[in-house]
Amino acid sequence: MTQDQLKQAVAQAAVDFILPKLDEKSVVGVGTGSTANFFIDALAQHKTAFDGAVASSEATAQRLKGHGIPVYELNSVSELEFYVDGADESDAHLNLIKGGGAALTREKIVAAVAKTFICIADASKLVPVLGAFPLPVEVIPMARSHVARQLVKLGGDPVYREGVVTDNGNVILDVYNLQITNPVELEAQINAIVGVVTNGLFAARPADLLLLGTPEGVKSLKAE
């Protein structure tokens, strides 16, 4: 199976998982990226089964609207039963690295509101230790150099992601060469740097369920 076929399979599995639990008042949180796009396309086949969605990026909002799915502001929604999103890496505890698509801050906010965070990914994303994928950090533009110096002190090698401005008007530093053995601690350390909006570690609020696309089929993993 191709990577896209694996992504399609996990996207459909996520729809199959949440659909029996949705009703006409349900609002679904939706992530950003190629795997999330497959989820949106699969979810759109059942758009009469729920009320609408909260999007984690402008790109996701446009795709949802293109399918005729109502998109709500998070501030207007009292609760989200589910948040479904992809990941760049996951460990066995379902700590994640996200933010390859630069939507990490809004993704983290929507995930924090959701009762159940479902991560959908192909098998290549499951790793023993996080950090081979560079860790994205969203930064207030004027603090970029300061934050980069602090990230070097933490053992990372930050690289400015040229030409990228987040939906919030900020910039991204991608931090290479981190061996992330304690993701909860590192997430807090980086977020404590003045000028950091947030970083792409989802460890304080990890995923609750990982649907992993493999050549043998979709596997469901809960945190070890």
UniProtKB/Swiss-Prot annotation:
One of its GO terms (biological process) is D-ribose metabolic process. Gene3D superfamilies: 3.30.70.260, 3.40.50.1360. It is an enzyme of class 5 (isomerase). Its EC number is 5.3.1.6. One of its GO terms (cellular component) is cytosol. GO terms for molecular function: ribose-5-phosphate isomerase activity. InterPro entries: NagB/RpiA_transferase-like, Ribose5P_isomerase_typA_subgr, Ribose5P_isomerase_type_A. The active site is at 107 (proton acceptor). It catalyses: aldehydo-D-ribose 5-phosphate = D-ribulose 5-phosphate. Pathway: Carbohydrate degradation; pentose phosphate pathway; D-ribose 5-phosphate from D-ribulose 5-phosphate (non-oxidative stage): step 1/1. Keywords: Isomerase. Substrate binds at residues 32-35, 85-88, 98-101, 125. Catalyzes the reversible conversion of ribose-5-phosphate to ribulose 5-phosphate. PANTHER family: RIBOSE-5-PHOSPHATE ISOMERASE. Belongs to the ribose 5-phosphate isomerase family. Homodimer. This is Ribose-5-phosphate isomerase A. The gene is rpiA.
